[in-house]
Amino acid sequence: MSRSETMYGQPIATCVLGHIRHPEEVPRLLTRAYRFPLNSSRVPVGEPLLEVRDVSLRFGGITALSEVSFTVVQGHVHAVIGPNGAGKSSLLNCASGLYRPQAGQILLHSRDEHGAASTHDLAKLKPHRIARLGVARSFQNIELFSHLTLLENLMLGRHVHMRHGLLPSMVWFGPARNQEVRHREFVEEVIDLLQLQAFRNHHVGSLAYGIQKRVELGRALCVEPALLLLDEPMAGMNAEEKEDMARYILDVHELRGVSVMLIEHDMGVVMDISNRVSVLDFGRLIGDGTPDEVRANEAVVEAYLGAD
């Protein structure tokens, strides 16, 4: 078989969990490579992609977020930083539908193939609807299926794009057959992008921590996101692993046109890879600007270092 017919020695035609099916059909089905879309939101670079407007979130008498507002611009890496307990993960949970704020809006902008604009308030939608709109996220604590292989975990990330039912998929019939091949091609491209080829058939639970974090990034990419939400993607990594992860995030952003909103505690990484930084402290926004502007913000310095 040629490179177009195989991926690392295995036929591409597989089911959603990677088990080989009907390899004799692969040459006929693979007519072109699936390409990771550039700027799937179709929002022009430099225009607002996500607007957080006066978002407030409370748990009983505890205020996690208080009237937080900022804008994530298409084509940017936007960092959200702050001390522990500042409300950063709560904000990502609101944007991904896990929490519903008591007040405010989280507006996602997009355009269709004809250029017609649409806006969705993520604060009112459930997680599966948000995923279908092109918002994907990773978690601070690894949330992978440890008993499945790397390939199988990434294939599960394609579920939001699957259009055929269980029976056609089981018998590998008609359009379901073509769809399955396309999903596998997409996953293989993500594996290439993140340089995970050597681990593709390994069970995720057996992989090193840094590789597992990369797999989680890959699964989020398999959603085909316009906006990628990353919750401390470098937590627990050593310096070399952080450098690698920063490079992969920049590759996703620069080569694939995916906008990124990330939470990260390593200020060196934040200042190096971010276009814009928003700072939270006790649920309130105390700074928003370029890395240089935030670095010079006295309120930010005080929140991190304390007042004299």
Predicted features, each with a name:
Residues G18, P23, P27-D308:
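Glycine-rich phosphate-binding loops of nucleotide-dependent enzymes
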Residues P11:
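Cationic, low-complexity basic patches in intrinsically disordered or flexible, solvent-exposed regions
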